[in-house]
Amino acid sequence: MTIQAIIPLVIMGGAFLLIAIVAHTTGQGNLDHIKSKTVGDGQHGTARWATKKEIQQTFKHIPFRPEAWRKGKDLPTDQGLVLGCVGGGPDIGSLWVTLFKQRKKAPERPAVQALVDTDDIHCLMIGASGIGKTAFFLYSNLEYACACGMSFLALDTKGDLARNYGTIASRYYGYQVAVIDLRNPTRSDGYNLLTLINHYMDICREDSENLAARAKAEKYAKILSKTIVNPDGDASQYGQNAFFYDAAEGLLTAVILLLAEYLPPDKKTGTEQRHIVSVFKLVQDLLAPSRSAKGKNGFQVLMNKLPDTHKARWFAGAALNSADQAMMSVMSTVLSRLNAFLDSELEQVLCFDSAINAESFASRKSAIFLILPEEDPSKNF
């Protein structure tokens, strides 16, 4: 190649190098240098980056010090979500010693401050695999929640959250921890869906005048029935079949209340017999024709033995006052909804009392880790 051909290439290479140096030194093209202002008159949208002043006003800057928090020192009091951080950076002290080969006092690393949003907000984290959604974002929020004393429910598909942060929450922050493992139910803590209903019904059995306890038992029974029969919260989507689902909801509430009231734990062993599997078995048994009353099934006979003022009889009124075929359809609807809980492994979870119930979750520092296998849709009930 001749000199005449090389000179233009050298000039072009120098020009590109000069452009690269200018772009690097001026910061053009860096996301940090995108202007925090809208374009035009909003015809392309009004979204923009927040300014430093707005960030300072919107988020609370709280020193993020897990080492001190786990020793019970400098615990934060502002509850919220950790959405970012400022400070930190490389270890300046180690770099100082490496460069200058002397043990003089080096500049300290800037303290990490968490940007905490203390408002009542929801946050959606979206990112590709491996960018740190769990390790950098979720773990930071779990640590901060433990330090603040916030109760939390963590959903997991593999069990990493329970293994990594269950022990930390219990050992260092004094949390009551429950792990509901639907991937390995035999290793899971218990989760009896009727725990609160049984608790308040036991109080009623000891003090029949305690109206508040009975009202709470009925409230939690209605909530459970609504969750099982109409998980979407509205039966109108079923069209002409809405009656059967509404009646099934009332019938299930009645059976749950009867079970909680008249089937106390075994006095000798203390074994709890009131759980969702017992509800299924009772409905199935009551579906059979009665031997004592011709033309009636077991459920109708049982309801006739209750006083007229008993709430269980009221809840089941829609089913009791319908035609025999319609009532059979209502009871079959209840059984079909309870089919999801029939599993020998799941019974190890559902037939034992809960380590944490809804009320203790709200009143004490609690952490519930729910492990849901995404490859097994039968566990999504």
Predicted regions and their residues:
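P-loop NTPase motor domains
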Residues: 88, 100-110, 114-381
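Basic- and hydrophobic-enriched, low-structure N-terminal and domain-boundary segments
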Residues: 1-131, 135-143, 148, 186, ...
